């Protein structure tokens, strides 16, 4: 499979979407401003990166889009813990700091769901039909995990997917089924997004939870009252996407591959309390 062709074709069809100030789904406009930077796939780091255009190397980078000087200038403002605003700021798991709108050294790049009308003739559920062409859904190799999401192409660190979709519920007793809901905390408001109904959710509902810390390659975070998933480890072709669904992330013990139990890192303000899968 031609990775370059896949990426470029996908970007041309869907546009470039990167979380931005006040709107994690904002599209960076193509303007007449000076463009001294490039958004690239960095082969060395296996990650989305921002570099100066003069340093672009076809052997090291796959170019995605030009970025204007103004676009880059607004990135990476460090925010103290006390000044954090969930509608403006995103926590960088690499730097362990808050940035507005996100970290410039470890930028985010949003891939949208496949947009379509409900097809009554399709054998696939609506949530399965929202799957981007970068993935496929098939039986997971994890024991008793059911269906899972598998990468068709290399997926770099920094890619963002979402938001997680489903029914908005006020209490757990409203869930259709356990294991598919995230708790959203926004100021004094608390509510759940229940993705158990495959006809009212999206493809993110099929992403399974890892058995061990080392298996996790995605991280869930909340911004603007919505849940997004971001890639924190490079995902190879035919590798399954895995995100932690702990009922009390940061406080519960998890088991490593060697059988030892330890506590997960406590600081991750964007992980929401979700029902375990």
UniProtKB/Swiss-Prot annotation:
Its main location: nucleus. Disruption phenotype: RNAi-mediated knockdown partially suppresses the sterility of spr-5 mutants (by101) and results in a slightly increased number of eggs laid as compared to the spr-5 single mutant. It is an enzyme of class 2 (transferase). It is found in: Nucleus. One of its GO terms (biological process) is methylation. GO terms for molecular function: histone H3K4 methyltransferase activity; histone H3K4 monomethyltransferase activity. Gene3D superfamilies: SET domain. It catalyses: N(6)-methyl-L-lysyl(4)-[histone H3] + S-adenosyl-L-methionine = N(6),N(6)-dimethyl-L-lysyl(4)-[histone H3] + S-adenosyl-L-homocysteine + H(+); L-lysyl(4)-[histone H3] + S-adenosyl-L-methionine = N(6)-methyl-L-lysyl(4)-[histone H3] + S-adenosyl-L-homocysteine + H(+). Residues 135-246 form the SET domain. One of its GO terms (cellular component) is nucleus. Keywords: Methyltransferase, Nucleus, S-adenosyl-L-methionine, Transferase. InterPro entries: PRDM7_9_PR-SET, SET_dom, SET_dom_sf, TR-Histone_Methyltrans. Expressed in the germline. Predominantly expressed in primary spermatocytes. Also expressed in the oocyte-producing germline of hermaphrodites. Its EC number is 2.1.1.-, 2.1.1.364. S-adenosyl-L-methionine binds at residue 245. Histone methyltransferase that specifically mono- and di-methylates 'Lys-4' of histone H3 in vitro. Does not tri-methylate 'Lys-4' of histone H3 in vitro. Promotes spermatid development and fertility by positively regulating the transcription of spermatocyte-specific genes in primary spermatocytes. Together with spr-5, required for transgenerational fertility. Belongs to the class V-like SAM-binding methyltransferase superfamily. This is Histone-lysine N-methyltransferase set-17. It comes from Caenorhabditis elegans.
């Amino acid at each position: 499979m031609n990775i370059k062709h896949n990426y470029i074709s996908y970007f041309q069809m869907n546009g470039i979407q990167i979380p931005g100030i006040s709107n994690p789904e904002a599209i960076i406009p193509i303007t007449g401003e000076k463009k001294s930077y490039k958004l690239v796939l960095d082969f060395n780091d296996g990650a989305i990166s921002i570099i100066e255009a003069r340093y672009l190397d076809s052997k090291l980078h796959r170019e995605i889009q030009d970025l204007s000087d103004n676009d880059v200038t607004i990135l990476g403002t460090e925010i103290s813990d006390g000044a954090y605003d969930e509608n403006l700021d995103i926590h960088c798991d690499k730097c362990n700091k808050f940035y507005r709108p996100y970290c410039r050294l470890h930028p985010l790049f949003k891939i949208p769901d496949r947009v379509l009308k409900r097809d009554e003739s399709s054998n696939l559920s609506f949530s399965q039909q929202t799957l981007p062409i970068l993935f496929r859904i098939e039986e997971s190799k994890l024991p008793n995990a059911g269906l899972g999401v598998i990468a068709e192409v290399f997926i770099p660190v920094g890619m963002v997917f979402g938001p997680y979709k489903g029914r908005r519920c006020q209490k757990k007793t409203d869930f259709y089924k356990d294991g598919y809901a995230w708790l959203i905390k926004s100021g004094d408001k608390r509510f759940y997004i229940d993705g158990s109904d495959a006809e009212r959710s999206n493809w993110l509902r099929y992403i399974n939870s890892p058995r061990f810390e080392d298996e996790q390659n995605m991280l869930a975070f909340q911004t603007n009252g919505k849940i997004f998933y971001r890639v924190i480890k490079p995902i190879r072709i035919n590798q399954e996407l895995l995100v932690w669904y702990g009922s009390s992330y940061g406080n519960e013990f998890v088991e490593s591959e060697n059988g030892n139990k330890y506590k997960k890192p406590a600081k991750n303000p964007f992980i929401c309390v979700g029902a375990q899968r």
